[in-house]
Each structure stands twice: as C-alpha cells, then as structure tokens.
C-alpha cells in the first residue's frame, strides 16, 4: 500500500500546542496545496541529513506496524480492514467512527495489554498530575471503573494563587451578625451557628477575588455573561437618556458653545461629563474584579467554608463547601468556575483551588480517563488522580519554584503517611541555562531516589533543532522519563481529519536530544495528540490538543499499568527498573529522527514482560550514576568548532541503591556486577570490561572525530551484564559530535549551499523531512540571510510551508538564547528570504523541516549568506556618561553600507530593599519531610512613579533562573498605596511591562530556602524597575573626535569596505535628559545599537546598548515632579503642609516651612524621603548671612509659632494664632493655618455627597445618643462659621484687582521683577485657598440648614472669583469646584472632578463619592460596580504569597 501513492489537492487546518512560560496556546497552521507521488523520506543523521526510504523499507514498516497490533482476533482485524477501506472510499457512508484513535492506545500496545491483563488497569495506583489543575467533574474523571469511588482523591493549589488570609477572628452577635472584610454585614443562621464547634463560637473572615483562579478566556466569558445579564440594559438606557438630554439642550440653545452664557456653559459641561462617565464605565467594565467574603469555622466534620457569592450577606444562600480531602466536594461559583478548598495552619490559611487552564484536565483524561465507552478511555482508567496545581494564575499559568517545592513536599508526605504516589506526570517545563545544579532539580531527584516515585515529564515542543529538550527532564541526574511526541496514521485520520494517512512519525516540533551537557533527555516517544475531556468551564466536552504534554501522560498511564500489574504479582520494582524496562523494550523506528524518539516508541507489553522475566535481577533496586568529567555531565557533547583531534574523557560510574541511606548494608557489600562495554561507533573507544562493586569506578573514553564528515554524529556506549545480556543495557553513555561546515576564508561573500545530487542543487522534501546543516559562523558575522525557492516545475502559485529553526548554543545559556523559529511560505516564482541574528565563531544549526502533515513533495533550493557589521573594541556596547566621549571601532564581514543608529528606550532604576525579614513559612505545607522547615526572606522595596508609565520589574541576581536557581522562589508582587495587587512577576518578568499610574508603590519579593544562612546572604539584593521612555533618546555619531566635542558635523552613513572605521558618540546633554523626564534615581538607560543600512539587517542585527548615567546630584528641590535633571538623579519633593482630605500633617522640618500654604492635592507623585519641605511663601531657604537683627528674630519666631498652629490641639492653636495676629496683623498665613487645624480636628468628611449623607442620618427620638448627635452638629456648625470668618480676613486684606492687573501684564521690566513675582504668587495662592475654604464652608453650612439654593449666589460669586486666577481643575481650586458642582446638582461635573482627584491620589473616600454620584443619578448598576471595585481596590492587608 505504501509502494506508490498519490494525494489529492486539498487544504487542511491543524492546530499545534506550543508552550510559552508554562502556558499552552494554540497556533493555527494552514497547509498548502501539494501533490505527493514519491516514496516517503525521513531523517537519518547523515551529512546531508536526508536519505530516501525505499519502497521495500516502507512496506516493511507497514507490515511491522500491523504485526505490532496482530494479537487481536482475526475477525476483529478483518472488520478493521474493511472499515479502513470504506473510510478511504470516494463514496458511501461509514457508520463506525475510529473512536479508538481519539485517545490513542493501540500504538504502544496498551489495548493488547489490557485485553491480556484486564485487571492490571491501573487499580491500586495513584498518579499525581503536576499541572494547571484537574476538574474532578470533567467527563471520565468523576469515578473509577466501579462507578462509585472518587477518581480525583486530592486537589491542591500549590502555587499560593488561591490562598486567603483567614487570621482575623470575629464573634457573631446574638443574632448571628458579623462584619466581613468587604465591609458588608453578614448573617449566620442559627443552623450555621449550631455547626460551629469553636469553643468561643468565633469564625474566621477573609476576602478573595477569584479572577486569577481560571483562564483569562473563561474570565472574559464570565464578565460577558454578567454584563449581558446585569449591565447592558440599564446602561444602554442611561446612555440613551444622557444623549437625549444633550440633544435637547443643543436644540434649546443653538449656536456655538463658546458663546453661551456662563451658567449655560457649565450646564452643557455637566451634560457632556455625564455621558463621558457612562462611556468610561462601559470601557472599564471588563477589568472590574469581584471579591467575595469568605467565612471559615470548624465543625464536627472538619472545616466548613462559606463564600458569599450573593454579595448580600445572606449566608444561607451563599456557597458552602467542606475540605476536599474529607468531602470531595466541588462547588460552582457561577456557570463557569467551580472550586474546592483546603485549610492550612489551623485555619489561618484557606486554599481555594481552581484551574488556571484546561491543560491539566486534558492531561489527566489521557492518563486515566474512565468512560462508558472504553474506546475513549485513558491509558490507565482505574488509576486514581491527585491534582497538584503548579501553574500560578497570577503569572498566566506559569509554574513557580514555590509551587513545585510544595507539590513535591506533598508527594513526600503522602508517601510517608502510607498514601503512596506511584507516578508523577509533569507536562510543564522551561529551558534551563544549565542542568548540573539547582534546588528544584535536587528535590526532583530526591522524590525519585528516596521515595521511589516514577516521574514522567514532557520533553518539550521546541524542535526540530537539536539540544532543545526542556527542564524537566533535563536535570542533574537522568532520573526522570522524558517523552517525545509521536503521531500515527490512525491519529491523522481520527483527530486531524486528514484525507490520507501518512506513515507514522514524530511531530515536527517535538524537542530533540541531546541535552546541552550531552545527556539523553528523551527516553521514549508516545502518541502526542488526543481529543480528550476538558473542564466544564470550557463549555465543551472534549478538545483536540497536541504536544509532548499529551505524550507524557500516555507514558504515565502506561507506567501505571505496569505498576498495577507488578503490585498484583507482588514483584518488587523501582523507578530505575521501570525506566530501564521501557527503554530496552521500546520499538526503535529506523525511519524516524533518532534524536526525537529516544529509545523508540513505547511498547507496554514488552516492558511488562521484561519486568516479570527479570524480577529477580540484582540491579532492579539501584541506579547507575554516570558523570562525565569534572562538570558531572550526563554525556559527551562536542560542539565547539571544528574537531581536529581525539579527546579523552574520564567517565565516573557509581551504583546507588534506591533510598541509599536506608538501604541494607549487606546488599551494598554483596553487590558486584561484571559489565561488557560496547561502543556503537568505531570513533568512540573504551575498555571492553568493567568489574563494578558498590563504589565509584572511572573509565577512560576516547572520542576521535577527526574522520567524521560535516554533520551530526551520535554514538552510545552500552553496558551489559555478562551474566544476563538478554535483559539489555544497565546504563548508557551517550556521545554526540557535531562537525561543522567551514566556509572558505577567501570568499567575498560567505555563502553556504548544501551538497545536492540534483542538477538544480535542490533538496527533496516529503512531509516531516528534516534537513540539518551545521555551519561555523565566520568572524565578524552578525546576521545571516536564508534564501529559499521551490524548483519544482509547473508549480505556479503553489507554495510550500517549511518550519525553519536556527540555533546557536552559548556557554551557560539555554537553547532559546540565540535562536529563530519561523514557518516560512516558499513558492517557485519568488525567493523567500528569512534573516536572523548569529554569533561569530559559534556553530550554527540550520534546520529546515517540511511540516509533518504538509502533503506533497517539494524540491527546495536554499542558500545561507552571512553578513555583519560590529564594533570590536572592548566594552563597545557600554557607555559611561562620566567618561565623556565613547569610541567605537567597527568592521564589516563584507562590504556593507553603514548607517548607525543608537536608540535608548528604557530608563533603569535600581531599587534597594527597605526591609529584609527572614521567617519560617507554613508548618503544614512548607516543611519538607522530615522536619526540614522552609524559610522565606521577604524583601520590601518602594517605587515612586511621577507620571503614568510602562514599567518592567525584575531581580537581577535571580532573573531568568528557575530550575537551575539556588533558591526555590523569586516571586515579587507590586502593590499600590492602598495595598491592592497591581502586578506579579517571577523568574522571567524582565520582558513584561505593566502600565502603572502615578503614585507610590510597594514591591515585596519572596525568596525561599530551607537554609537560613543562605537567605541571609541575599538580604541586600536589589530590584530593577525599567521604565519605557515616552520617546526614545537617539544619540548622534561623529567621525571626527573634535567635531564630537563641539557638536559639529555628524556622521550619517557611508560604505564600509574591508577596513576599520572609528566613530564617536557624545554624552547626552543635561537639557535632553531634563526634557526626557527620566524617573528619579535613574541609574542607566538601555536600548539597541544597529549598524547596517540594509533594512533586513537593521531588524535582526541589533546590539543591546547600555548608557550609564552620572550619579545623582543632591540639591534643594521645589514643589512638583522630577524632570530628570542631573542625569535623572534629582527628584522633586512634596512640600504640602495640608493634605487633600484635611488630615493633620506631620511637623515641618524647618520653621520656615510652617508658613507654606500649598494646594490640597500636593504631595502626590515622586518624592525623596527625608527631604525638608520647601517654603512656598517666599521665605529664604537658608539663614541670612551675618548676625540676625531684631526683625529677623521676630520673623523667625513668627514662623515657628505658625508651625505650631498646625501641630497643636485646637485650643492651644487658637492661643498661638491670637499671639501671631496681635504681633503681625498682616500675616495672612496664620488664618489659613488655623483653618487647617480646624478642618483636621473637627471636619472629617470633605467630599460633598459623603458629607451630605452623613448629615441625613436620622437622629434618635430621644436619649443620650440624640443629645450627643446634636452636640456634634453644633460643633461642626461652629467650626464652619469660624472658617468663614478666618477666610474673610484673608479675602478682605488681599487686593484681588491688583493681582489681576499684575497677571495681565505681558512683560514686567522692573529691576525687582522676580521679587515682585514671588510676592504676587504668594498673595494669589493665599487668596485662592481662602476663597476655596470659604466656599466649601458656606456650602456645608447650607447643607446643615437645608438651604443650598439660597446660598447659590454666594457660592457662584466665590467660584467666579477663583476661576479668574486658575482653572477649576487646578489642584488649588478643585475641592471647591466639586462643592460648586454639587450645589448646582451637576453630577457630571462632580464625576469629572473626583476622577481628577483619583488621578492624583486614589482613596476610598473618592470611590465612595463616585458611588454616591451614580446613586444620585439613579445609576444603581454603576453604583454596584463601584462598590465591587472598592472591595478589591482597598484591601486590609497585602496579599499572601
């Protein structure tokens, strides 16, 4: 059947799952229209990396594939053949669907195994799923095969994302009423109170937003549904009404708005702002998060959790749920999200378990799904599941060190307590920079080596280039089973709707061996796609997913079958015997890329036979540690230039028993094995025999690559027990050698073209053909251009899709550091060009693959051209401003047109910790058995943002490290001034920017380890905040040093031949730094430098550039925000004596500052701690020279007295005020300072509707409380009247007409103009504040007297007087403008002013006022939303890690 065949033209769309930071995403691939009429081609690892598989070979493969499944009954086989023929027919309806291939099992012998051993179906086996969470209500995951026993026996969120702080205890009153952390009143019914077994009947309260407990897509669906149900109708009605009012006003007042009278103008403004308010809430609705009150108390059946999903406080109608480990309860929060709970630390922490993606449920379904139809069962349908969520929802489902360690700790605990975890499946991973060390890897080894858990991990979806295996399985020891992804013909038909079945193969994107240190990361391959169950929140029963994430659970399920059988036969096993069995019995696929399949395709039947046949083998309970050289590499890997000499290696081999520390000493003493060592290739040599007892032996291995042709070459040294050769090798030493092509040095343009037997120099590609070329990148090359074209005749506009993957390995860097992955469309009419960055002197792998499902044969002609321009002088890409002019010596690989450009795009601020505190973590889930307490070092940092900016935050010493890190966690959380969580980051946060509003922020960084002394060493670790500049800073180049000094003729472009050109860069001027508005304390600027004029080269050949600024200058500051002067080192200080809400300020640092009268909103933005306030009254900033005279003394004493007016109690303040006024009757500042004192002591509510609502509270009929309320109102009235009198004094003593005349001047030519301006500004600010204070007091008095309309004339007069000097939005006037809008009933204007105040400083009072505004307008749906926003925006404490 495979001899010759032809595929019909058709288009097909497939989906491939890629892993990005632990989160799976689907990428659609549209495949071309191509015909196939040639035999199949496959990779074989020769120089050209491609060979033809002959027709007999393909026939042999087909026959072997059929033989592997021939244990079924003949009748079944005939029926299957007939079904296959009918499916391939051009007409007719097929009544049977190939359901068995939806969750494939036949390929690996699982079906035959279960048919032979139906009782070995995974019973008595538990699989831990380290993933994004498992839905126990998904189809097939509810129960075991008996239909009764729960399948998902435990659910844990190990990430901390679902943690709720429940430390606060409250006791209900006699009616069961308590106050939740949301501020809502909650009522416990007598039934609930009776369940409470707490001795004091106390309950614990907490607050939780569930927004990060489910994927963003599902969160959007929830928001969309809620919006449709509760928002759209009232909001659309309100919007229409607001629009209608505007139309009516315009029809009644025709003409230009600017020509309207003043009262009509503000009315029009109000209507416009009402509509603007409605539109703004419509835009932000999707970002609003809902937080729920959580109540927790003990009962006779364990802890009971109540979540007030009603938001009304009626706990009888709220969600009730018990601990999952006791009750296995899962409850729906809404139509999408279901949760379970666990309780830790005696009730102090409530763990709410959700799911950060559907991935974990899909994985579990493959491993252990149990369905009514056995065709779609998982591999081990009767195995139990323990769900361990390691994907943190705060990080978009990426795994964290904290989650991994907690998950491993829980596995250890369960094994220790007799609830054994037999298998771990981990379809997660990243790429580590090195694998021979790291705390996470060490603990993984401990789980396997000490607790005997078989750990299965996905190899990764990062192929087809070599050295792309992820971590895990690439850790310090090869203790894990790594799995590659395979696709069978049956899967192609059933899962992908392909019109023809191609021969089985690995997926193009599955990661490839070797590990960077030479080890083997891929143990076996298995089916890597399935249409399996997904969580209910997807609103789908099943979905197609593919990737090594799907291959790993297939193997994990298969291991569960093996262990189930071994347990029932009472055969002792270990993770080592399991791994060796599946390795030596795997079906080697000779036509498949050997670097992708490991030992071959998993064969469950043969693996079980091997385990039972060799049950008495003395090596079943031990592993063989293989370490190469001093770095303890797992294998030998030569990829460092051209190999011209043989190399000798010392390889250390050590047998280690399972749980070595507790192993029987007699077993160690008696152990001896005599080994025969066999190298698979003649260019690898070693001794033939090794006698090995329980201890370390070393052998010498010589690798002689001198005779190897360019390409990749692999070999392996296998060690066989001479007493039992048939059980296969006990261990292997993998060897990989890469010999690169070296381009001729005399070439004008270095170009690589592959050798080809075709006349047109093309290479033939079939589906999944992989062509690898290894080229030594020439010196001075910085980028390469790949040119491709199809040479097949008569192709017309037909195109081919090629997966191009280039990779260069750099020391102590992951494979992702310098690589390019791209799917390129290639046609026959025009060349397709792909450019990418390269590193000179390093071997480049150019890997071109035809996608696995891409029908048709193509002949591809391609070439690789190297180009480059770079600076070669030391520290060329780092410039220090303090060193002046920076020099660049640039050279080109070939003749290039040079047009350098240097753009600095980010400003980097170093943040030093303000606090570092080491403390023990949870005593229940952060203690590694036995008794190894994990500690945290919690570092706190302050970040001030002067204006809204995009900011990235990272910890340099922990950045880009996870599995290889010495510490197990480096998570940080960014909080605003109200302790609301704004952003979260971890190992890879340096590339993620967050939009931050103006304000002050706190960053908390948690670093974890079990050794306190190590944590102490990082107490001074700093963070870096990277601010995106609003516009990049571009630096100029000069060809002449002197021209650079004077800023003369600039260098633009010129041709660069085979010579060196010197260019100079001048430091950035202070003026430009000031205009750039850099953040305070900026340490350096970062950006990119490009040299080539060629546009393609400019996109890819970018050199990271760092510009180090001069140290910050310390000097006096003025009110306002930092403008980035002094190399962005200077900052502004907030010098306000008053605050926006009238709170009593701190004492000023100097007497002179006491007379400062500033705007109510001052003090927001960037500030420097410990800087003294600045006197805005015009008093000198420093003492006068010489001895002080009597006038100086009097003035200083006056200023000191004024400073005490603000600080003292009101009675004392009045006395000091009287003294100041008596001595200095014209000193108007004293009046305003006394007003501030009165406001801070007696007037708490400053915003209009808040104040009004406080006065509307109905007084009691009689009694002591009524008298007290009347007395309080009397005090308020007295205070307001006093404010009016004090303000009147200032207003009467200030000549407003003179001020207006002065500010009407265009130019003041008087000699003392500056002094006059200072004095006039002082008078203006004093007058504005007095007018504002009086206006607010008058409005409040009118509210108390319920005669606001009678006071409108006076309020309007004060308002019009203020706006003669400043705009109503000005911070000096906005508080009174808010009251003026209230007096007129202009709620739209009120909204606008409150939003302006929020931009300056976000407080709960502002949100309360917004809610009241919408309540007054009748917008109850908006009021409800604002109340929700307040709960989330103003938490009582920082969120838990």
UniProtKB/Swiss-Prot annotation:
Coiled-coil intervals: none
Activity regulation, free text: Inhibited by phenylmethanesulfonyl fluoride (PMSF) and butabindide, but not by peptidase inhibitor pepstatin, EDTA, nor bestatin.
Biased amino acid composition, Basic and acidic residues: 75-85, 1265-1274
Listed InterPro entries: Peptidase_S8/S53_dom, Peptidase_S8/S53_dom_sf, Peptidase_S8_His-AS, Peptidase_S8_Ser-AS, Peptidase_S8_subtilisin-like, Peptidase_S8_subtilisin-rel, TPP_II_domain, TPPII_C_art
Start-end of Low complexity biased regions: 1139-1155
PROSITE patterns: SUBTILASE (PS51892), SUBTILASE_HIS (PS00137), SUBTILASE_SER (PS00138)
Known partners and oligomeric status: Homooligomer; forms a complex of 6 MDa probably composed of 40 subunits. Forms a structure consisting of 2 segmented and twisted strands that form a spindle-shaped structure. Each strand is composed of 10 segments (a segment being a homodimer oriented head to head), stacking of these segments leads to the formation of a twisted single strand. 2 strands compose the fully assembled spindle.
Similarity annotation: Belongs to the peptidase S8 family.
Name of the molecule in the record: Tripeptidyl-peptidase 2
Organism: Drosophila melanogaster (Fruit fly)
């Amino acid at each position: 059947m495979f001899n010759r065949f032809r595929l019909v033209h058709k288009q097909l769309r497939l989906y491939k799952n890629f892993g990005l930071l632990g989160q799976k995403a689907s990428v659609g691939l549209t495949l071309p229209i191509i015909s196939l009429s040639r035999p199949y081609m496959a990779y074989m690892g020769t120089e050209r990396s491609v060979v033809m598989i002959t027709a007999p070979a393909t026939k042999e493969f087909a026959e072997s594939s059929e033989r592997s499944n021939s244990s079924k009954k003949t009748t079944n086989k005939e029926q299957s053949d007939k079904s296959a023929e009918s499916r391939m027919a051009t007409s007719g309806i097929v009544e049977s669907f190939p359901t068995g291939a939806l969750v494939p099992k036949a390929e690996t012998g699982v079906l035959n195994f279960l048919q032979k051993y139906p009782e070995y179906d995974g019973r008595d086996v538990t699989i831990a799923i380290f993933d994004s969470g498992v839905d126990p209500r998904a189809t097939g995951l509810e129960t075991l095969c008996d239909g009764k026993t729960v399948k998902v026996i435990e659910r844990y969120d190990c990430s901390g994302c679902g943690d709720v702080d429940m430390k606060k205890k409250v006791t209900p009153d006699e009616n069961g009423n308590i106050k939740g952390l949301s501020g809502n009143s909650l009522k416990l019914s007598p039934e609930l109170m009776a369940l409470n077994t707490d001795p004091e009947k106390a309950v614990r309260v907490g607050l939780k937003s569930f927004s990060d407990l489910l994927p963003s897509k599902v969160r959007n669906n929830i928001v969309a549904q809620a919006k449709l149900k509760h928002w759209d109708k009232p909001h659309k009605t309100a919007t229409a009404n607001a629009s209608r009012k505007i139309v009516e006003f315009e029809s009644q007042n025709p003409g230009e708005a600017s020509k309207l009278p003043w009262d009509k103008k503000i009315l029009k403004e109000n209507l416009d702002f009402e509509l603007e308010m409605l539109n703004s809430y419509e835009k932000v609705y999707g970002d609003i998060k809902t937080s729920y009150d959580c109540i927790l108390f003990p009962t006779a059946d364990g802890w009971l959790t109540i979540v007030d999903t009603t938001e009304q406080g009626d706990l009888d109608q709220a969600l009730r749920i018990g601990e999952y480990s006791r009750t296995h309860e899962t409850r729906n929060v809404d139509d999408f999200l279901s949760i379970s709970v666990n309780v830790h630390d005696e009730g102090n922490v409530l763990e709410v378990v959700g799911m950060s993606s559907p991935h974990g449920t899909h994985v579990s379904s493959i491993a252990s799904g149990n369905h009514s139809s056995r065709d779609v069962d998982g591999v081990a349908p009767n195995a139990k599941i323990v769900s361990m969520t390691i994907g943190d929802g705060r990080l978009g489902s990426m795994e964290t060190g904290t989650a991994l360690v907690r998950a491993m700790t829980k596995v250890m605990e369960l094994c220790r307590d007799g609830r054994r975890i037999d298998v771990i499946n981990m379809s997660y991973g990243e790429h580590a920079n090195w694998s021979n060390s790291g705390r996470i890897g060490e603990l993984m080894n401990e789980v396997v080596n000490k607790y005997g858990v078989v750990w299965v991990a996905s190899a990764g979806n990062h192929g087809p280039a070599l050295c792309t295996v992820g971590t895990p399985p690439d850790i310090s020891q090869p203790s894990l089973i790594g799995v590659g992804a395979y696709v069978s013909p049956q899967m192609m038909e059933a899962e992908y709707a392909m019109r023809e079945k191609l021969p089985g193969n690995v997926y193009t994107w599955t990661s490839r061996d070797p590990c960077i240190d030479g080890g083997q990361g891929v143990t076996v391959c298995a089916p890597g796609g399935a249409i399996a169950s997904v969580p209910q929140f997807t609103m789908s029963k099943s979905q197609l997913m593919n990737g090594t994430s799907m291959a790993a659970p297939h193997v994990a399920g298969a291991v569960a079958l093996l262990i189930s059988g071994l347990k029932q036969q009472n055969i002792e096993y270990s993770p080592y015997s399991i791994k060796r069995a599946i390795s030596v019995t795997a079906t080697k696929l000779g036509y498949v890329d050997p670097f992708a399949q490991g030992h071959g395709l998993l064969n469950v039947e043969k693996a079980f036979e091997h385990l039972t046949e060799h049950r008495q083998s003395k090596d079943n309970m031990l592993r063989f540690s293989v370490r190469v050289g001093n770095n303890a590499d797992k294998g030998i890997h030569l990829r460092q230039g051209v190999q011209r000499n043989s190399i000798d290696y010392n390889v250390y081999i050590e047998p280690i028993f399972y749980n070595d520390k507790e192993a029987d000493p007699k077993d160690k003493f008696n152990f001896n094995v005599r080994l025969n060592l066999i190298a698979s290739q003649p260019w690898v040599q070693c001794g033939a025999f090794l006698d090995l007892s329980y201890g370390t032996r070393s052998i010498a291995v010589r690798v002689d690559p001198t005779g190897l042709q360019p390409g990749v070459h692999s070999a392996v040294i296998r060690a066989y027990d001479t007493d039992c050769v048939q059980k296969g090798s006990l261990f292997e030493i993998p060897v990989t050698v890469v010999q690169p092509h070296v381009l001729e040095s005399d070439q004008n343009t270095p170009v690589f073209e592959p050798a080809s037997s075709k006349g047109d120099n093309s290479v033939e590609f079939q589906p999944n053909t992989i062509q690898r070329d290894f080229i030594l990148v020439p010196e001075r090359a910085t980028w390469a251009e790949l040119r491709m074209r199809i040479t097949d005749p008569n192709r017309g506009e037909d195109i081919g899709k090629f997966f191009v993957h280039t990779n260069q390995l750099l020391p102590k860097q992951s494979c992702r550091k310098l690589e390019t992955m791209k799917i390129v469309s290639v046609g026959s009419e025009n060349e397709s060009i792909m450019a990418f960055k390269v590193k000179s002197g390093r071997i480049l792998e150019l890997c071109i693959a035809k996608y696995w499902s891409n029908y048709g044969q193509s002949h591809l002609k391609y070439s690789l051209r190297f180009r480059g321009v770079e600076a070669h002088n030391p520290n060329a890409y780092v410039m220090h401003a303090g060193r002046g002019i920076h020099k660049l010596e640039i050279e080109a690989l070939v003749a290039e047109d040079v047009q350098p450009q240097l753009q600095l795009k980010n400003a980097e601020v170093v943040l030093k910790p303000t606090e570092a505190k080491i403390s023990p973590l949870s005593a229940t889930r952060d203690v590694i058995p036995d008794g190894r307490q994990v500690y945290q070092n919690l570092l706190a940092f302050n970040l001030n943002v002067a204006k809204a900016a995009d900011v990235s935050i990272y910890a340099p010493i922990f950045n880009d490290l996870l599995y290889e890190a010495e510490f197990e966690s480096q998570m940080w959380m960014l909080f605003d001034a109200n302790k609301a969580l704004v952003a979260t980051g971890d190992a890879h946060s340096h590339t993620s920017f967050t939009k931050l509003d103006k304000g002050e922020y706190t960053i908390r960084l948690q670093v974890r380890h079990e050794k306190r002394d190590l944590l102490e060493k990082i107490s001074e670790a700093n963070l870096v905040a990277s601010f995106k500049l609003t516009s990049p800073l571009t630096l100029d180049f000069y060809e002449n040093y002197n021209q650079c000094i004077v800023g003369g003729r600039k260098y633009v472009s010129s041709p660069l031949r085979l010579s060196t050109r010197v260019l100079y860069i001048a430091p950035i001027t202070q003026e430009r730094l000031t205009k750039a508005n850099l953040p305070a304390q900026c340490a350096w600027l970062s950006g990119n430098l490009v040299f080539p004029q060629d546009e393609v080269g400019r996109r890819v050949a970018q050199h990271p550039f760092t510009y180090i600024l001069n140290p910050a200058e310390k000097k006096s500051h003025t009110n306002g925000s930092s403008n980035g002067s002094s190399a962005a080192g200077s900052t502004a200080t907030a010098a306000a004596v008053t605050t926006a809400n009238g709170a009593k300020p701190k004492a000023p640092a100097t007497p002179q500052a006491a007379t400062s009268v500033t705007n109510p909103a001052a003090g927001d933005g960037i500030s420097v701690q410990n800087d003294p306030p600045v006197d805005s009254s015009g008093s000198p900033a420093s003492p006068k020279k010489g001895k002080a005279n009597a006038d100086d003394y009097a003035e200083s004493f006056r200023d000191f007295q004024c400073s005490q007016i603000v600080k003292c109690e009101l009675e004392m303040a009045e006395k000091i005020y009287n003294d100041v006024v008596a001595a200095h009757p014209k000193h108007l500042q004293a009046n305003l300072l006394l007003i501030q004192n009165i406001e801070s002591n007696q007037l708490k509510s400053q915003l209009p509707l808040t104040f009004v609502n406080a006065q509307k509270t109905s007084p009691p009929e009689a009694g002591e409380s009524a008298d007290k309320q009347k007395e309080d109102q009397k005090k308020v009235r007295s205070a307001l009247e006093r404010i009016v009198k004090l303000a009147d004094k200032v207003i009467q003593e200030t000549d407003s007409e003179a001020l207006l005349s002065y500010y009407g001047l265009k130019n003041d030519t008087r000699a003392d103009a500056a002094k006059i301006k200072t004095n006039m500004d002082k008078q203006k600010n004093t007058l504005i504040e007095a007018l504002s204070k009086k206006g607010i007091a008058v409005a409040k008095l009118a509210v108390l007297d319920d005669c606001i309309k009678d006071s409108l004339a006076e309020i309007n007069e004060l308002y019009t007087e203020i706006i003669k000097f400043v705009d109503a939005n000005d911070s000096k006037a906005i508080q009174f403008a808010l009251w003026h809008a209230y007096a007129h009933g202009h709620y739209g204007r009120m909204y606008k002013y409150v939003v302006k105040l929020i931009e300056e400083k976000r407080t709960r009072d502002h949100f309360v006022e917004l809610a009241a505004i919408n309540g007054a307008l009748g917008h109850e749906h908006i009021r409800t939303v604002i109340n929700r926003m307040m709960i989330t925006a103003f938490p009582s404490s920082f969120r838990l890690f």
